[in-house]
């Protein structure tokens, strides 16, 4: 039998998570290759989130291999990386309808499948949701496992740290998988890191630590002795062990782990399942893995329209400039003439059309991460200091910062310009991304001016008018495309 035929057989024989559990490591690795080909073939036609899904194949396989969904709950942060999960949970044959009318959603959707534990679309909430599930389980007295899968980008959102802080104090059995596919949260220091990560989670280590405590308690002044040992241990941890921040929050930390190695992932996840209390597994994956164009430029292949699989080039229906293009060009033009112009983004610089601005005026571009609330208050202080901040943001994400818009901008009548992209109906991204709520909350805020251009020419004029002719807060809202 040829290798290609065998690969087809592996994918053809897998429809539900229980099918994965019958495979050996070699077959799982072959299945990972086949899944990447399957995703590429389909997303090149339908469009969707590509690079993140190519990077998370092995991790998704390992999660479904080790856990018993839907009894065990897997909570996906944002959810745009859940394509493999959908394929493995009975939706393979519907995958050609991804993001189409009456087709599969591009995000987890409980009404679509019981394997989708929670509706997702916005970032940084998975740990909060998982902790809620875990506490509900504890009150019921049931025994299901609860896992949150969150990316390093989502970890820049403040709500994720609020949840980590709460989860660490709860001592509830919860596993957080940190999918690190871009920024290095902590460097992999090789064999020592792996050894310490394994050592600290082994039952023998935990029992030995408890035995030492009992022994020390027999001596006079044992408390002072224990405290000295703890201080020494903590100094060593800060020098050698990655992930100390998570340990300080109350988590047992395992990692970094190769997130594209199925065998290692299965071993680590199975070990984590048997640890009492909150556990964080730090996995490092390669965004865009298996498709050279996405590997070389993962940001460009984060969200894609239909494209030519052989060249990676987008199949555009029109070469007409988009509203985002016009916005970016106008921002560059104004910044060329005015050194008070500042652009602010919440991890969406490229998506909002600011690529050229970033290249031409890097010192006046601030990407604050997935932190819309922070971005608004940050922009308010820039305005208070005499600058002209323009916060470029998708409508659906700006609603997360309602309180800051009201308190920090509008009530103080500060001149912050909100460039509200993807306003109105956005189509394929579904109900979690529609930009249909901003008008209702903008128009009841004091001092706010709302402007809506009908074309690119009006957008340029309105943006300039908003920056130079209005003293208070302004929202310029424009659609996708």
What are these regions (language model features)?
Residues 49-170, 340-341, 346, 354-355:
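Cofactor-binding active-site loop characterized by glycine-rich and histidine/acidic residues
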Residues 125-149, 154-195, 200, 207-210, ...:
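Hydrophobic, small-residue-rich alpha-helical packing segments that form membrane-like cores
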Residues 73, 285-399, 404-413:
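Non-catalytic terminal/interface segments that mediate subunit docking, oligomerization
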Residues 84-90, 155-164, 185-197, 266-268, ...:
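Short acidic, glycine/serine/threonine-rich loops at helix termini
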